[in-house]
């Protein structure tokens, strides 16, 4: 088939399922078309895609500015590059940096196929059997629309790359890459980074485009060049979503800082969501962190719905779902912003832990984390930062992130605080200054394991010192290691987990606790007439109000000759016995129910 360059007509057909996104269901723009195509054609397209990709990379048909759908490239590469360019100017006194974030209207659907084939033939040197195959593939594209069980007749599609085809992203990248060539041939200039003679003119990730400049006039020239490019190649810019951000250290946008596309003024905004990370005009990440936290909370809500629908989901499974679905949201882009502990980020996991335990504000955050055997998110954030640093070290010198890194190193040496400064500080803080000096780690996988363990060990020391409340002293005696106790996994009922957790944390609603030299409230038990202090020993072993359920649930050894020692022993033994935990949980629930009933009389 490849030898003949002929593409079967049946493979060129697709069935489109319109999927409603949001908004008015009568508006066509609020639907995303999902195209179903022949499976065999997908396999064939994958083979063609691999050959074309190898050819494009070998002949540098795709510029460094395009990071979309390329091996070894990611959204984080572009996010880091943009952040580095902004830091270059914001670390100067009065520095300003300008970025136009471009949104194309239905970019993939608007590609002019004749011009695409011309571009492939004339600009990239793709010819022969490959060119014949691509031309045949796009010579007779047809689609139909299916809604419910009804389907339309097939109709011709004359524009756009094929939806659902694995080859389409690469073809679009080749198509859009011509923009950089036109910018280079114009009077615009790139942002200087270390050793690149052209500099950075723009950043692309598939159809996500950002034009960058260090002055107002040059950015307008780039916009004019973009306008000519769109007119020439048939693309349309969505002005309602195309914005300019003026990066600066405070102050207002100047009157002269305004730009026009096609005679229409481009809106200047204080922040922009670029590739999932919100860039603030002063490079403050607080809004980005809040946005990620909000998305993560929605994902947690989905887990909770699943938890209440399927009551018997093991706790270990719930945490695996959290690590798979929620944590990646919280950590997205942390390679550039994850140098500190953000309360909004940590609270998502803390509240999830408390939800599993069935507790609320009555249990300290650090205790809830300890009961669930979890570590703070910032540990993963630090690891991702260092992992990305190692990735940059392994890049070749043509890559934008590597050039930006070398630029930031030079700035750091001159006293300008930036991303590199923070990397160095983390490595020195945790005893790996020699790694910074060597500018590499050798076996990166081994280093990451050692580095993460160092962070965990450091946190364990801090965790112990943070339990400074008198009520927490006893808790430390039977929760020595930061491992999840058996009851959390073994007790299916959240009510039972709550009872044991409150018991272990000394947070049951008893009248008084005097065991640690601090009296809380009226110490006398008002459930019985013994005129005794209502501490845990009285509650568990002595109070006659609970005699019947005590005989039922508490082993006789503990309450025959009650003592503080036996209470502590009971809690320690609960770490090893699920059956004992279950009995004690039932006792606590029943006893607290009796207590509330008598107090309400």
Residue ranges and their predicted role:
Residues 1-178, 182:
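Conserved pre-catalytic core of RNA-dependent polymerases
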Residues 16, 32, 44, 48, ...:
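Mobile genetic element proteins and their domesticated derivatives, centered on retroelements
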Residues 106-124, 202-231, 248-250, 283-285:
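Catalytic palm subdomain of template-directed nucleic-acid polymerases
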Residues 141-144, 243-254, 372-377:
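Short, conserved secondary-structure transition motifs
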Residues 237-270:
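Short, conserved micro-motifs composed of acidic
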Residues 263-337:
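Basic, alpha-helical interaction scaffolds
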Residues 306, 468-601:
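Family-specific functional microsites
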Residues 319-325, 348-349, 360-509:
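Extended C-terminal regions of large enzymes
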